């Protein structure tokens, strides 16, 4: 099957997206006749369908993605040089609910996971070492390597020390955010045993931190305060870790329904194909999982700017709508208070890949949330309380946002990318390429190829293949970031460092 040269995403769009590089003089058929390409235009970029005056809107996905900086001719390459964002400051919004039922059949699908005492299910069974403060990162890493050498990982999936720079010299929200995220990591179902390791004199006082965990299982979570150890703190830590290991190594996978899955949705290194391949594929999966009773979480609040009303009007209640409005405007205020414009998000890589404005990026980004109603809105560091589609307050930064998704309780993060990235957070971070070229050139980074969608594969066919892949990972198949050992955490910081 011959691949199409371009795609008009919505019938109301005044641009098409090039599915391959297009050359001067090539024809594009429109409802008003044939136009000719005026400039060499790379794949993923936009070509204008009709003459447009200065300040007139550029329409993509059926919505404005900005306005023309100057008069533009039909056939012109539309990019960041001739289009400008419409975004500015905070806005007032009106709740106009547009909630559509998901007409997706229920399927009896299962995976084998680790059932935890609180009813949550893990897809990994790892030993984690969680520093309360960055001062003990080195000890934590040494303990992890020593336990790995001693046990050879028999009966468990991994041993990880989650390094970070915080836990001291922080005040206010930064201090609380650090404590919340570290608490969430300790309570995550993907771990079968946690050693909380403290220095002892830090702002994040160990005894107070342990109180945040509530009624925790003392056979699964233990504390070591290194300043209180007389002698070798490494040996003291190993004595605790051996007990945690022997407990976790007894855990066995059990068959559970897919409604136990909580999946984070993230994109990074996006390009012009993100909104027509990988993000819609993830959105189709999200709708399917929610129809089965499962949960997905969408974040990257600054990358919702320009598409936020779509999500707001999918909120189930006026209260959820108001929480979403606050989430959006709080992030805009955060930008403005730091002297940053709200619409200058697209990175050099985004622009090179065909994304020209933040609206362009946002309308593609939010497609990862499919069409399901918004059932929950979470603050940073807050854990999932209701099944269905949740929105989470966190920035667009890949490491910070992915960590926040995992901290909310997601057992896995689906990460779409057009440019490619190797990183992963503290849960399996599955990379989905927007184009086949990336999938072929970076097989050591990428786990699944959504580029097939512009090469003749039907969405339903690829979605089903994608579901099978996700369930295989839930059953224990490693994704590339796990194979490579690229796993880390990053915590959101807003204020001063003492």
Q: Can you describe what each PLM-predicted range is?
A:
Residues 2-412, 419-422, 427-498:
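Metallocofactor- and cofactor-centric catalytic cores in central/energy metabolism, strongly enriched
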């Amino acid at each position: 099957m011959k691949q199409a040269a371009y795609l008009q995403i919505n019938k109301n769009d005044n641009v098409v997206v090039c599915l391959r590089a297009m050359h001067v003089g090539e024809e594009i058929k429109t409802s008003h006749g044939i136009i000719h390409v005026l400039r060499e235009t790379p794949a993923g970029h936009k070509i204008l369908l009709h003459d447009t005056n200065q300040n007139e809107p550029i329409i993509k996905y059926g919505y404005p993605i900005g306005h023309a900086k100057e008069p533009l001719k039909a056939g012109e390459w539309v990019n960041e040089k001739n289009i400008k964002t419409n975004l500015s400051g905070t806005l007032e919004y009106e709740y106009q609910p547009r909630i559509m039922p998901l007409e997706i059949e229920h399927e009896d699908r299962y995976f084998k996971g680790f059932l935890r005492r609180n009813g949550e299910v893990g897809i990994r069974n790892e030993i984690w070492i969680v520093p309360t403060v960055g001062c003990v990162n080195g000890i934590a890493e040494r303990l992890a390597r020593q336990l790995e050498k001693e046990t050879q990982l028999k009966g468990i999936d991994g041993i990880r020390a989650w390094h970070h720079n915080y836990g001291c010299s922080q005040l206010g929200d930064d201090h609380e955010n650090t404590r919340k995220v570290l608490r969430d990591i300790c309570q995550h179902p993907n771990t079968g045993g946690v050693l909380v390791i403290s220095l002892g004199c830090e702002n994040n006082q160990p005894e107070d931190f342990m109180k945040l965990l509530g009624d925790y299982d003392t056979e699964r979570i233990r504390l070591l305060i290194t300043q209180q150890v007389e002698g070798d703190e490494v040996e003291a830590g190993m004595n605790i870790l051996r007990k945690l290991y022997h407990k976790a190594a007894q855990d066995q996978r059990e068959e559970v329904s897919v409604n136990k899955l909580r999946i984070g949705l993230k994109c990074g290194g996006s390009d012009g194909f993100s909104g027509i391949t990988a993000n819609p594929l993830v959105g189709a999966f999200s709708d399917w999982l929610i129809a089965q009773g499962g949960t997905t979480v969408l974040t990257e609040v600054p990358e919702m700017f320009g598409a936020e009303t779509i999500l707001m009007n999918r909120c189930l209640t006026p209260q959820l709508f108001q929480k979403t409005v606050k989430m959006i405007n709080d992030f805009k205020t955060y930008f403005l208070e730091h002297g940053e414009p709200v619409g200058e998000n697209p990175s050099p890589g985004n622009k090179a890949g065909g994304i020209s404005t933040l609206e362009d990026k946002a309308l593609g980004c939010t497609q990862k949330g499919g069409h399901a109603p918004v059932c929950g809105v979470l603050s940073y560091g807050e854990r999932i309380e209701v099944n269905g589609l949740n929105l989470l307050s966190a920035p667009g930064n890949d490491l910070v946002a992915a960590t926040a998704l995992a901290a909310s309780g997601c057992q896995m993060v689906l990460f779409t990318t057009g440019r490619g990235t190797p990183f992963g957070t503290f849960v399996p971070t599955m990379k989905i390429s927007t184009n086949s070229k990336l999938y072929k050139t970076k097989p050591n980074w990428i786990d699944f190829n959504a580029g097939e969608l512009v090469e003749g594969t039907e969405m339903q066919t690829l979605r089903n293949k994608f579901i099978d892949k996700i369930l295989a990972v839930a059953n224990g198949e490693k994704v590339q970031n796990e194979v490579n050992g690229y796993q880390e955490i990053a915590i959101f910081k807003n204020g001063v460092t003492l």
